[in-house]
Amino acid sequence: MKLFLILLVLPLASCFFTCNSNANLSMLQLGVPDNSSTIVTGLLPTHWFCANQSTSVYSANGFFYIDVGNHRSAFALHTGYYDANQYYIYVTNEIGLNASVTLKICKFSRNTTFDFLSNASSSFDCIVNLLFTEQLGAPLGITISGETVRLHLYNVTRTFYVPAAYKLTKLSVKCYFNYSCVFSVVNATVTVNVTTHNGRVVNYTVCDDCNGYTDNIFSVQQDGRIPNGFPFNNWFLLTNGSTLVDGVSRLYQPLRLTCLWPVPGLKSSTGFVYFNATGSDVNCNGYQHNSVVDVMRYNLNFSANSLDNLKSGVIVFKTLQYDVLFYCSNSSSGVLDTTIPFGPSSQPYYCFINSTINTTHVSTFVGILPPTVREIVVARTGQFYINGFKYFDLGFIEAVNFNVTTASATDFWTVAFATFVDVLVNVSATNIQNLLYCDSPFEKLQCEHLQFGLQDGFYSANFLDDNVLPETYVALPIYYQHTDINFTATASFGGSCYVCKPHQVNISLNGNTSVCVRTSHFSIRYIYNRVKSGSPGDSSWHIYLKSGTCPFSFSKLNNFQKFKTICFSTVEVPGSCNFPLEATWHYTSYTIVGALYVTWSEGNSITGVPYPVSGIREFSNLVLNNCTKYNIYDYVGTGIIRSSNQSLAGGITYVSNSGNLLGFKNVSTGNIFIVTPCNQPDQVAVYQQSIIGAMTAVNESRYGLQNLLQLPNFYYVSNGGNNCTTAVMTYSNFGICADGSLIPVRPRNSSDNGISAIITANLSIPSNWTTSVQVEYLQITSTPIVVDCATYVCNGNPRCKNLLKQYTSACKTIEDALRLSAHLETNDVSSMLTFDSNAFSLANVTSFGDYNLSSVLPQRNIRSSRIAGRSALEDLLFSKVVTSGLGTVDVDYKSCTKGLSIADLACAQYYNGIMVLPGVADAERMAMYTGSLIGGMVLGGLTSAAAIPFSLALQARLNYVALQTDVLQENQKILAASFNKAINNIVASFSSVNDAITQTAEAIHTVTIALNKIQDVVNQQGSALNHLTSQLRHNFQAISNSIQAIYDRLDSIQADQQVDRLITGRLAALNAFVSQVLNKYTEVRGSRRLAQQKINECVKSQSNRYGFCGNGTHIFSIVNSAPDGLLFLHTVLLPTDYKNVKAWSGICVDGIYGYVLRQPNLVLYSDNGVFRVTSRVMFQPRLPVLSDFVQIYNCNVTFVNISRVELHTVIPDYVDVNKTLQEFAQNLPKYVKPNFDLTPFNLTYLNLSSELKQLEAKTASLFQTTVELQGLIDQINSTYVDLKLLNRFENYIKWPWWVWLIISVVFVVLLSLLVFCCLSTGCCGCCNCLTSSMRGCCDCGSTKLPYYEFEKVHVQ
């Protein structure tokens, strides 16, 4: 990536020595987060210029300006001509430092040319009219994007909507003195890496290909492909229903791009964009192809802090009739609030579409916006998707106006113009992880097998046929009687209601309510009539037929569909299926207004045809020499029809034994036509992710291969040169080389002679050995599997279970076979293995003998004793100040003063001979020394001595601070030296740690390889189960693979027929799975017996069989458990050197006496005329002795000639394998193989010898590394830092006297009030008693009235 560093000291290049060098970009306002490194894309400065006195005019979309001195300058963005209705942008500053700056976006009243900028002052109708103080060296910028003007002011970034701002493409610059300003002309979008700190820009780097955009912006490849490695952060698969969560799937998605248009956050687009990537200011990034696309994908990219980043914006769709507005609001009332969140939103947003037809305004609710909107997709056919899910359908769309801006400079979006293409996608958590285009032959092969990488081997390729094939129809000449049926829907509207359903819909069949076909052929068509009532909403409604419950679609009825009987009706008839008639308003609201009901029966007497025919005719449509889908005399299929020169008198159709159509005769002309398969599946050879060869049935070049070779049974095409000798893969008796060349594979000649010569033979005897550890894995068990047959087949459907009962004991047989095999498996494993309970006891990690692990184990929290200090009440009554002291100065000072402020100076301490006082003084001490200072100033020289205590105390406290700083500096030097030493040791240590980790990683990699081999065995059963589960997706020629869906769509009889197909297919799949499981049990049982033999012979004893316990001479073996099996580690001897000798089977003396070796493992050989014997195991020659030989009768060797029939009389247990297999094959019953591909179970034999060797080498390397690390650790431990400690001193400062006075006054007042309340209430009674006594003794004119008892008087 090419980077340009824009230096912070401006200007650059030729301006550096003439412009003010203090100008920089630290104050540039971009709206980016503080204290962060951010990628910003937009109209930003790159190259800077120094202006002179003349007026300069540039083509620009904006500018940035830096005032560098006490001079005047002016800038204007204009159109180059005067327009009274046009807004212009004008910036000027006054002479002088910190002068005023004028910024205007206004219209001007007179014909100003903007060439001189001298009379551009009379303005009106201003959008922006600012007057502010300039900041020397701070940049000021103005950029234009569409109709949005962005101002980069000194302390803020703001945007304004300016009509026709895109016309302001001329920049006039006037600097009234030389070198009075530095400016940058902006005319292109750039990407900048900006680093901010404390509100300032500390790094400003411009890049052409910034890494920050690689996650969201890419360069489209020439064929419109998205490059490999693109992370698809904000791309989703489009769906009209369920969303794929995880897995690999082949889909048809809009992922072929013709243009990728990045729209930064500092720009906006306000015009319509068309589906051919034209309109507005579309700027494609990289590849561009001028064509009409299917969709436009708007991918929103925002930062994590963009929560509730709301901007006013709308999405406008231009349809054939009118414009439709899409907007969202956080109010469910549907109030027009054109807000679209750019980033995560913290509250729900309700979305509506709005349209205005004539003068009527209509809003329709379409859904709730997701919490985080990452992608918006608009299809040309009217579909609207958010995050991959379809929200509504508008019909055909001509253009889109995505008028959305963001408040954050770091946010942006991209517009991808895409078409639908066949792709293979890997999805994880609904996110696209990988993408493969199914274009080239090899890519199609990958897509056929749903794999992103194919292993080397041969694959069947049958993807050459076109998806859409022409149709061939051939029938016998018959007398045609035709019936035309018109299904008519007439809709009438009334009033001015747009979203209400039609006022009335009349449906009829040829003017009646029902029609039954009585002729041999019929054609039916749907007619929609709209009665014009003057309502403006008529054209917005559409009425069409939907796919209903019939097993055929309405559009296919005329495609030569055959029936025995068929009737149509507009009213429901018992036993009929239906096609609903649906009305939709602008494809947003849907209403069922009727239905077409069909009753039919299977047969061939009535045929639907696309157009009317009558009379005796041969209705045929024959496609020759091309792959076609045919219906020939009721034989249906696909194939290539060719004319033949044969002449056959009998018959009109010719089929094979399997029922396939081979040829037919035209009954009118007598011509014979042959039918061959379209493209028989080819066998392609894949090597290193490419097709290197192909075996085909036709003589033509394919797959980009040119060299064609004709063989007896097939054609072979490749690009090989036919000059190789080594095959990388074999097919039958042919070998395929790396370049695709085809070579014959001949039987390999064995170097071993199976039969020893009677007289002599050349033998190789080992003379040197090496020890080897060989690994062998044997599977001894597999996980038992039990399948609930009824649940698997019927998935709980009760009607399906009733049908399943008719299959008698099918499920019972399957379940019993699995259950019995699992039971036998468990018994065999239990009888074979015994477990030692002591081996599974968990050791206590704290008691490992002499090893103390307490330093590495978690410790319990032990609460330390409380440090002596003041009480809680004292902490409440005093303000505590914590300082760092010198040695014992603070403690000694505190004990000397005993809390008295008057003793402050008298208790001064000395540290290294210098008088010091603690740095903290309370209010009392400050008042005391303030009084001393004021007293020394009252009478000048007479009282100057009174200020001595103040000066001494001040100097002593300054000494305290100075000494404290000195100690800190000394500690800093000690720490720096020790830290540097420690860093050197740590760096060296971690370098060794890095090497050790590297070795460990490589060792773990070898272990991973070994474990993967074991994992393959473990996962075989899971693969089989996965294959069994995948069979549930097959419909087995039923109309659906869902039983419930079948019963929902069809009547009971038809549904039972369809479900019966599912039951048959699923039972067949289940039987195949059970066969696999039983075969696997048999294999595991044999492997278990072999493992038991190896335990007895290899582990418990030493084997004499060469190659049984490892590939060598066995020494000893160790067995360990492994997943589902045992892992044997065989230690064997392997020969490294051999001695070749000419061995003798014996010696013959004078032709009469024969002597042969007594021991079978001895060899007699001759060495330069001297006979010696040696062991076959190890070459140890010695002279023979008499005890080594045994005498035989003579030297003759006699053979007995017998026939194969008589051989069993000599060898009773001899078995002729070939004859046995031949008889077995002849006695096999004839059966038809099920049409299922069975996933093979491969018994895996592991070879971990190379991995173990690597592990041993890595272990030795790790041990050496640990020794080096120990030395480095010792050096690190020696790095001891001895610091001078600053004591932590706590000092309590008393509150001032007036605080205590206030507390005392408050306390006295509260106490008085409390006593008064107690004495004044009845609870105490003191006051009441005293007042009563006094009133009794002397009544001093009390005003209290005496108490009189009232008497009730009745008045007559």
UniProtKB/Swiss-Prot annotation:
Residues covered by region (S1): 16-717, 19-717
Report residue spans for region: Fusion peptide: 934-954
- Molecular function terms, GO-annotated: host cell surface receptor binding
Q: What does altering residue 109 to G do?
A: In strain: Isolate BE03-40001 and Isolate NL
| Domain of life where this protein originates | Viruses
Does Protease count among this protein's keywords?
no
Q: List the disulfide bonds.
A: 106-126, 175-181, 207-210, 259-284, 328-351, 438-447, 497-500, 516-567, 550-577, 627-678, 724-737, 789-811, 794-800, 896-907, 1098-1109
Q: Which residues form a coiled coil?
A: 1015-1059, 1244-1286
Residue ranges of the region described as Interaction with host ANPEP: 598-728
UniProt effect for mutating residue 125 to H = In strain: Isolate BE03-40001
What does the annotation give as the result of altering residue 113 to S?
In strain: Isolate BE03-40001 and Isolate NL
| Cleavable signal peptide | 1-18
Location of region: S2? 718-1356
Q: Transmembrane stretches, by residue range?
A: 1297-1316
Subcellular localization is given as: Virion membrane; Host endoplasmic reticulum-Golgi intermediate compartment membrane
- What is any one of the record's Gene Ontology cellular component terms? membrane
Result, substituting residue 138 to V = In strain: Isolate BE03-40001 and Isolate NL
Q: How does it assemble?
A: Homotrimer. During virus morphogenesis, found in a complex with M proteins. Interacts with host ACE2.
Q: Please provide the record's free-text comment about the domains of this protein.
A: The KxHxx motif seems to function as an ER retrieval signal.
This molecule's function is given as: S1 region attaches the virion to the cell membrane by interacting with host ACE2, initiating the infection. Binding to the receptor probably induces conformational changes in the S glycoprotein unmasking the fusion peptide and activating membranes fusion. S2 region belongs to the class I viral fusion protein. Under the current model, the protein has at least 3 conformational states: pre-fusion native state, pre-hairpin intermediate state, and post-fusion hairpin state.
Q: What name has this protein been given in UniProt?
A: Spike glycoprotein
